[in-house]
Amino acid sequence: MDYKKSLNLPDTPFPMRGDLAKREPGWVAEWEETQVYQAIRAASRGRPRFVLHDGPPYANGDIHIGHAVNKILKDIIVKSRNMAGYDAHYVPGWDCHGMPIEIQIEKKYGKHLPVTEVQSKARAYALEQIDRQRKDFKRLGVLGDWHNPYLTMNFSNEADEIRVLGRILEKGYVFRGLKPVNWCFDCGSALAEAEVEYADRVDPAIDVAFPFTDRGALARAFGLDEVDAGAIVIWTTTPWTIPSNQALNVHPEIDYALVRVTPAPVHGPLLLLAQERVEPSLKAWGLEGEIIATAKGEALEGLRFRHPLAAAAQGYDRTSPIYLGDYVTLDTGTGVVHSAPAYGIEDFVSCKAHGLADSDILGPVMGDGKFVDSLPLFGGLSIWDANPRIVEALKLADSLMLVQKLSHSYMHCWRHKTPVIYRATSQWFAGMDVKPRDGGPSLRESALAGIDATAFYPAWGRARLHAMIANRPDWTLSRQRQWGVPMAFFVHKETGELHPRTVELLEQIAQRVEKGGIEAWQSLDPRELLGDEAELYEKNRDTLDVWFDSGSTHATVLGGKDGVLGGSHGAELAWPADLYLEGSDQHRGWFHSSLLTGCMLYGHPPYKGLLTHGFVVDGQGRKMSKSVGNVIAPQKVSDSLGAEILRLWVASTDYSGELSISDEILKRVVESYRRIRNTLRFLLANVADFDAVGQAVPYGELFEIDRYALAMTAQMQAEVQGHYERYDFHPAVSRLQTFCSEDLGAFYLDILKDRLYTTAAGSAARRSAQTALLDITQTLLKLMAPILSFTAEEAWKILAGSALAKQADAPRVTIFTEVYHALPPFADGEALTAKWTRLRAIRAEVQRKLEEVRSAGAIGSSLQAEVDLYANAADHDILASLGDDLRFVLIVSRATVHADADDLRIEIAASGHKKCERCWHWRPDVGQDADHPEICGRCVSNLFGAGEPRTRA
């Protein structure tokens, strides 16, 4: 007889190899065809709402690995929340306006298209990009409302954004003023804080002398009767700002010194600078000197000094006063700061505080980075080309003390990678320290309070965002672009004032935009709204900062706190969102702008929690770079290894820091995936012939080890669900992996094989095991589904068509409409766990001893061994309680327990009996049945009799 055929060998259509790259697109197509997302919505209707609001990626270019990380994390959260019993929608969004798309239109069609044509072509281009990105996001296994995303360029969104502008204007936050803003010459526009990045740059660092003018006043400040000629010395890394100098700054508490130097410079023998900087400065200038007097900075306030280029051109023959400034430091330079209010925030604030009118601020730099033609000596030059000319002019005017090359971190445009300057322009602002008209705290105060009320994942994000809000300037709302939501104001031609009915007019304009998009504002004749007044007003040509676009989506998409706007997806989503999730750069970007708009509109943040993930780097910790050649595209990984591997990599990595990826790292992820898949295959194969309705064993009648396995599974499930709840995905993956490899593979399933394969197919022993395995399989698949979505769905289809097929509440078409599995509570769960934890420890000791004996050549497999265990009372009771089933737990042919006063002692010997050809145990009763001499007594009973007596394992 071929006894192998008498075994219950496992079988399943779930293949060992996932063949993910080839098979995943089929699942994506099936989810689309069967409308899985809509099925999830129907199954979740009426449950508590959970809202993850999607931070919109920009609609330009293919997705990169950072996009994949972001979307996969969001998908894990939404799926896990749905399976935890929430109604969690996922409405993807796209950011559509702004410079990058405008640049693409200029590249393709030139720079001189009419504005309406730029807008229509930009709109079409954005739609093309969205289609490309949407396809790639869906390929990652991300489920969402892909047919109805929110787009910031949707007419309704553009209209509601204008309404948001009207509301914050009405509240008193918006004003127009001259201020230095981040300015990119290539963009020809102001930039948001989030659009500025820092890179190293080499600039000339110069020490410049401003000659004394009123020597009598200077002498009195230092307590002297008189002083010789000389100069105060400043240090700057922006020579191009010297023509615009209008003041000097010193620190009120710093000691300043008058130094007599030799050889004497042309402007005189005295130099004025901070006392602490005298020694290093004289050394750098190649001068000797002695301090003749000192004074605190506050004594110098109001003293005036001649412009250093006065001797070079009459247009610079003016003086600059000293203003006090707490921001002056002694880290570098001379302790004296030159102030050009048009090109520095602190300079601007200081000069304005001392009464300088906007009209008196010198701003010779045009939007393209060139000086106005009328500027003496340097008119028409770009500021960067002017730098060496200015240095040379200072030298000829005998005002240059020193020039050096300095490498330093400097502001750059994140799009063009070119230097950015501060430039005073007339812009529209949201005031950080403005009190709203209806009373209450300022925007800065309410935003800081909102940060304190927000949950941060990881926790360090709170301090980072807090510092940014505490120190940020007013928000520059306006941009000088064409493809953007208009700041649809009518401005008086003479006074510059807004029309008195602006809020009302904005609503009328919004209604037009709702029907025709932002193009409706472009084509609007002012007379249609203003009548005869139209001659007095002009249309404001500024557009809103794109960060206002995305930053107001909590109102335009979620519907806002009061529901007045409704929101494009207000019915599915809710305000505030439970979670915003983006990369760490969004503390400066979307988190930031959303916080400010939320606080301006409603006095609160639009989110309850912020989750931040790090950037992706290679295996050596380097940023992804085409020049370095270390870029890993998500499309390539999906096409070669499968998106499932990307998903597992994301979930396995601690996203709170940098996420490392490389071919080697992905190979390790593939190995982890294979181990999980093999576990699933074993589980599915061993419940393939099981009917959950007609063959399940009541939980109270399960074998002891099966009850323990379920208690162990319940504990694992609670831990993993807790990790999901806290957005801790890498510990969740780790726990699932150890459960599969250690709790199941190396323990429970290892022990179970004998019972599953050798007992009668319909025996209570085998059905008990299958009952437990089915619960374990369902639990495991549902816990894995948010991460390993393709694999869980594949396995679920098989399970639903076999073991679960006859259930009255048979599983739905997809695992994603399920909730986490409800495991039975066991009254003796804690006692079982304590007992079997000790049994596993003893088993590990036995296995170690068995390995020693096997290595010595005394036995082959562990089944050739017979074990004697000498145990103290506590261990003896535990071991003896299993009776003959102990040998199955230890996977040996005999296990005998002996009472002993001492700690555990294990003796192992090779069996002297014959090996059963069916179960491979070495037993004394092999050969005793004349009809079946090749097999042991229990196999004879299992095949031809009542079956072996077995209740524990």
From Swiss-Prot:
Motif 'HIGH' region: positions: 57-67
Entry keywords, A to Z: Aminoacyl-tRNA synthetase, ATP-binding, Cytoplasm, Ligase, Metal-binding, Nucleotide-binding, Protein biosynthesis, Zinc
Highest rank taxon of the organism: Bacteria
Entry binding sites for Zn(2+): 916, 919, 936, 939
Cofactor binding annotation: Binds 1 zinc ion per subunit.
Entry cofactors: Zn(2+)
Ranges in a coiled coil: none
Broad enzyme group: ligase
Motif extent ('KMSKS' region): 623-627
One Gene Ontology biological process: isoleucyl-tRNA aminoacylation
Residues where L-isoleucyl-5'-AMP binds: 582
Keyword Lipid biosynthesis: no
InterPro entries documented for this protein: aa-tRNA-synth_I_CS, aa-tRNA-synth_Ia, Anticodon_Ile_BEm, Ile-tRNA-ligase, Ile-tRNA-ligase_type1, Ile-tRNA_ligase, M/V/L/I-tRNA-synth_anticd-bd, Rossmann-like_a/b/a_fold
Catalytic function, reaction form: tRNA(Ile) + L-isoleucine + ATP = L-isoleucyl-tRNA(Ile) + AMP + diphosphate
Binding site for ATP: 626
Keyword ATP-binding: yes
Recorded GO MF terms: aminoacyl-tRNA deacylase activity; ATP binding; isoleucine-tRNA ligase activity; tRNA binding; zinc ion binding
Protein localization: Cytoplasm
UniProt free text on domains: IleRS has two distinct active sites: one for aminoacylation and one for editing. The misactivated valine is translocated from the active site to the editing site, which sterically excludes the correctly activated isoleucine. The single editing site contains two valyl binding pockets, one specific for each substrate (Val-AMP or Val-tRNA(Ile)).
HAMAP family documented for this protein: Ile_tRNA_synth_type1
Family to which the UniProt record says this protein belongs: Belongs to the class-I aminoacyl-tRNA synthetase family. IleS type 1 subfamily.
Protein's recorded name: Isoleucine--tRNA ligase
